[in-house]
A protein has these predicted regions:
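Left-handed beta-helix
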Residues: 1-8, 13, 196-209, 223-375
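Conserved N-terminal catalytic core of the sugar/cofactor nucleotidyltransferase
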Residues: 1-11, 19-28, 33-141, 169-171, ...
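Short coil/turn connectors at secondary-structure junctions
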Residues: 5-7, 53-54, 82-83, 118-120, ...
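Short beta-strand segments
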Residues: 12-13, 124-126, 152-153, 179, ...
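Short acidic/His/Gly/Ser-rich catalytic and metal-binding motifs that mark active-site loops
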Residues: 17-22, 186-190, 355
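Proline-centered turn/helix-capping motifs that create local helix->coil transitions or kinks
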Residues: 74-83, 171-179, 184-188, 278-285
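Conserved beta-strand termini and adjacent loop/short-helix elements that scaffold enzyme active sites
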Residues: 88-90, 152, 254-256
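Conserved core of the sugar-phosphate nucleotidyltransferase
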Residues: 133-220, 232-233
C-alpha cells in the first residue's frame, strides 16, 4: 500500500503522562513498554508504515531519552528511501521561550520543520492508543469527500459515551456537532449516527452498542487548513481547535469498527495488557499482513525450567525456573527464580542482565537483584 499523495504523520507524545505515573517517572509516555516486548509508540508508527506512510515525526517534551534511543535503534529506513521517523523535542528559540502548552501548540511550534516535507496532508496520531488501522483507506475517504478535516470515529454505546468526545454527523458523514464527555443523564439522542451512513460505511445496522460516534483523536488535515486553524493562540486540538473547525469548515467522519483502546491510565494499561494474554484477545498481534514493529534485540529464546505456565506471554531473553505463572505477561530479560507464583501480573522486564559481581554487590548493600526472587 503506497500513498500517491504526499502525506506526513505527526505522533503526539509530549505530555507528562501523569495518569500513567509511575510508569512515566523516567520515560516519555510513548516509550512505556507494552505487551512484553513493544513500546507504545510502536503502534502508531507501525500503522503508518503498513499504510505506506514513511515520513513520521514524533513530538516529545518530557523524559525523552529512552524514546530517542528506541526510535534510533528501531526505525532506520534504507539509503534510497525518503522515509524517516524523527523525534522533535520541545525547544526554546529566539521566537519562543516556552515549552509545549498543549497538543495544538506542539504542532504549531514545529510547523517550520514540517514545511520542509511539502506535504499535502497532515495525519495527527496519538502515542498512547492500541489499534490497527489502514490509514491509507482513511486518507482516500478524506480526499474523496472533499473535506478539510477528517476525524476517525469509533461507533460506541451510550454507556461508553460518557468518557469520550461525541460526534454528530449527517447522512453523508459530514460532522455537524461535537460534545466532550456528556454526563450519563444528559439527552444526546440528536448525536445518534444516521442509519444510512452506518450502512454505507460499515455495512451494519445501528443498534444499542454502536449508535453514537466517539472521536478517536486521529485526524487528517489538508496541509493548508491545519496551518490556518493553528494561526492563533489556542493550545489543544480536542478542546479548542476541533470544535471550532467543525463549526466553520467541512469536516468528515471516518468510521472505524476495529479494536481501539486509549491506554492513557494505569487501569487501562493493565487491563489491555492482560487481555493480550487471554485465549481470544481483543487485539491480535499475530497479523502477518499488518505487523507491529519494534526493536530487534537479538536476545535468545526464553528458557523455561520445571514451570507451570498458562494464558501468558513470555518475551525473549527470559529465564524462568520452577514457577507458577497464569494470566500474566513477562517482559524481556526477566529472571524468575524457583518458587515464584504470578497471577495477573505484568512484569516489565529489564534493560540488561546483572553480572555475578553486581549481584554480589547487591547482597552487600542489602538490595534485591533485578527480576523476581525465590518464592
Amino acid at each position: 500500500m503506497r500513498c500517491k499523495e504526499k502525506a506526513m504523520a505527526i505522533v503526539l507524545g509530549g505530555g507528562k503522562g501523569t495518569r500513567l505515573y509511575p510508569l512515566t517517572m523516567d520515560r516519555a509516555k510513548p516509550a512505556v513498554p507494552f505487551a512484553g516486548k513493544y513500546r507504545l509508540v510502536d503502534i502508531p508508527i507501525s500503522n503508518c508504515i503498513n499504510s505506506g506512510i514513511r515520513q513520521i515525526y514524533i513530538l516529545t517534551q518530557f523524559n525523552s531519552a529512552s524514546l530517542h534511543n528506541h526510535i534510533a535503534n528501531t526505525y532506520v529506513f534504507d539509503t534510497f528511501s525518503n522515509g524517516f521517523v524523527e523525534i522533535l523535542a520541545a525547544e526554546q528559540t529566539n521566537q519562543t521561550d516556552t515549552w509545549y502548552q498543549g497538543t495544538a501548540d506542539a504542532v504549531r511550534k514545529n510547523l517550520k520543520h514540517f514545511h520542509d516535507q511539502d506535504a499535502d496532508y497532515y495525519i495527527i496520531l496519538s502515542g498512547d492508543q492500541l489499534y490497527r488501522m489502514d490509514i491509507k483507506d482513511m486518507l482516500d475517504q478524506h480526499i474523496a469527500s472533499g473535506a478539510e478535516l477528517t476525524i476517525a470515529s469509533k461507533p460506541i454505546s451510550r454507556e461508553q459515551a460518557t468518557g469520550l468526545g461525541i460526534i454528530g454527523c449527517d447522512e453523508q458523514g459530514f460532522i455537524t456537532k461535537f460534545y466532550e464527555k456528556p454526563a450519563n443523564d444528559l439527552d444526546i439522542s440528536e448525536y445518534k449516527v444516521p442509519a444510512s451512513y452506518m450502512k454505507d460505511s460499515l455495512g451494519k445496522e445501528v443498534g444499542e452498542n454502536n449508535e453514537y460516534l466517539a472521536s478517536m483523536g486521529i485526524y487528517i488535515f489538508n496541509a493548508k487548513t491545519m496551518e490556518e486553524v493553528l494561526n492563533n493562540n489556542k493550545t489543544d486540538f480536542g478542546k479548542e481547535i476541533i470544535p471550532d473547525v467543525i463549526k466553520q469548515r467541512k469536516v468528515s467522519a471516518y468510521l472505524f469498527e476495529g479494536f481501539w483502546e486509549d491506554i492513557g491510565t494505569i487501569k487501562a494499561f493493565y487491563e489491555t495488557n492482560l487481555d493480550l494474554a487471554s485465549i481470544s484477545p481483543q487485539f491480535n498481534f499475530y497479523d502477518e499482513q499488518m505487523p507491529i514493529y519494534t526493536h530487534r534485540r537479538h536476545l535468545p529464546a526464553t528458557k523455561v525450567n520445571f514451570c507451570n505456565i498458562s494464558n501468558s506471554l513470555t518475551s525473549e531473553g527470559s529465564i524462568i525456573t520452577n514457577a507458577y505463572i497464569v494470566n500474566s505477561i513477562i517482559g524481556v530479560r526477566t529472571l524468575i527464580e524457583s518458587g515464584a507464583s504470578l497471577d495477573g501480573v505484568y512484569c516489565m522486564g529489564a534493560s540488561y542482565y546483572e553480572t555475578e559481581e553486581e549481584k554480589a554487590e547487591n547482597t552487600k548493600k542489602g538490595i534485591p537483584n533485578i527480576g523476581i526472587g525465590r518464592g
